[in-house]
Amino acid sequence: MNSKRRPFYFLATVALIVAAPRAKAELIQVTWDSNGRYEHQLTVAPAKFAEVCDRLKPGAQVQWTFEGSAPMNFNIHYHEDKAVRFPAKEDGSTSSKGTLNVTSEQVYCWTWSNKGQADVRLKLELLKQP
């Protein structure tokens, strides 16, 4: 390795190590209650995201609703091979609701991204129908 590049690689490595904990997102596994309901409140930091996920089977329906203290980007997605599919996607929403109709067995994720400069308080509710 060229000795002139060593300081650059060292500084780049240190920067990645220092930044890694701050880049951590909040990933949450859904835990349904006996009535098929899931409720959660959290805070999404600036430039971070929160993701709530669960494996769902075909025929299931999930009614979802959320309210945030400021606009966020929102989506419901799943991965199919290398492709990402989005049954729902909204930008700049402070609240929304809808129903996810599950057509294939996948891990579905409800995701909120905070593109703002301040923390956003988020309250969400999911209700699963078998």
Regions found by a protein language model. Give the residues of each.
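N-terminal signal peptide c-region/cleavage motif recognized by signal peptidases
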Residues: 19-20
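Acidic, Ser/Thr/Pro
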Residues: 24-130
